[in-house]
Amino acid sequence: MIHHLFVLDFVMIIILQKRKRQNCMKAKILFRVLLTIICIAGAYPLISWMDSNSYKFRRFSGSFLVLMLAIPFLFSSCNSRNTKEEMQRITVKSSSDRIVSEWLDSIKVDVWAIHTDVPVAPIQSMDVIGNKCFVLDVFKRIFLIDIEKRLVLKSDITLGNARNEMLSPICLTADEEHVYVYDGMKECIFVLSYDLKLCQIVNTGCFFSTFRKIDNGFACLSMGSEQNFLFLRDDGVPVYSKQLSDKYPDEMQDGNPIQIGLDGYPYVKAYYSDTVFKWNGQELVESVQFDYGMGEPGGDYQKGSQLAHSGIAYTESYFLTNTHVLSSFVETDGRTIHYNLYDKENGVSCSGKMAPIDNVYFRATLQHGKEAYAVVLADEACVYGLKDIDMNNIVIIRYTFPS
């Protein structure tokens, strides 16, 4: 009878191992019922056998029985997973526009049109911290826009090959104290004060296309023949890298692949990728994956070329709140914007066009917690539904998500 019990234990352990891959509640309930039946079936003949033996042996066998029946549960405990940390899978499909409209109604929109005496060229990179907006235009000029004072300040740092000169600034980011401008030719980060004066130069020795300042370093995305995430320490030393996609867009887009979520953690989603990753301070972990019904195995996020051939050209923007995930894609014609909104609480995803919020369309670029921003020139304001904007104005749009 003892060896029969070992067999039962072995069967239960196998079932427990398979159970780890089960995510639905029905499977868990059926498993518990089956496990109870197996335990009872194995225990009953053993108890009858022990009754025919001495009291001392029955005491030993009883303890042995408890131990044997506890083994599968010990395996279950040691191999259990925290389902709250598992990747969230989103199946993109059409649904009622009611979900979209209700979510849009919960967003607050603020618009500032600020006059500038210095013409600003099309914006290449931007960041917003509080009432301060920092802009890098395609002419490699850096501007500070004070929203509260409605002033525009231009940096006096000149372009050149001298040590304290920028040769080819391509992106910027900011925190509560400094502005960080990355020079792609010199492969270094120029650290500026809020009045755009040079404070420090940090050598990186690596190339990337965009980055965000985060705790203890920089979250970066490099684009060459593929797209890779890099984490640099504050001293510019790269200490972590991960490939996110095997394809990159032919030209840079308006969206930002690195966003700061409501939880304060940075998230990254490469162009031509179906997976949003979260940086937990040590490594990237999968957070959200979009299923586009392509018949490919889940988690195959590196094969971005498959998305390029499926009619979805690239991700323009994505935003994560406590209740929703919004992503926008530009189709292969380069003009049609396709929105996907996922309702976490109701488990519903909606796909289609988005109505304006207070006559302003949602086309944000950058997310900082519960706020998302777009900075546009006057001639681009019509895309957002804004009218009668003076040509000497630069427009800042802030979208505030519900808490």
PLM features: what roles do these ranges have?
Residues V118-V120, I157-N164, N203-S209, L244-D250, ...:
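Short coil/turn segments at the loop-to-beta-strand junctions that recur within blades
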Residues P122-S125, M166-C171, C206-K213, D250-I258, ...:
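Repeated scaffold domains used in trafficking and secretory/extracellular systems
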Residues K132-D137, E177-D183, N216-M223, G261-A270, ...:
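Short beta-strand elements that form the blades of beta-propeller/WD-repeat-like
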Residues F75-S77:
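C-terminal motif of bacterial Sec signal peptides marking the signal peptidase cleavage site
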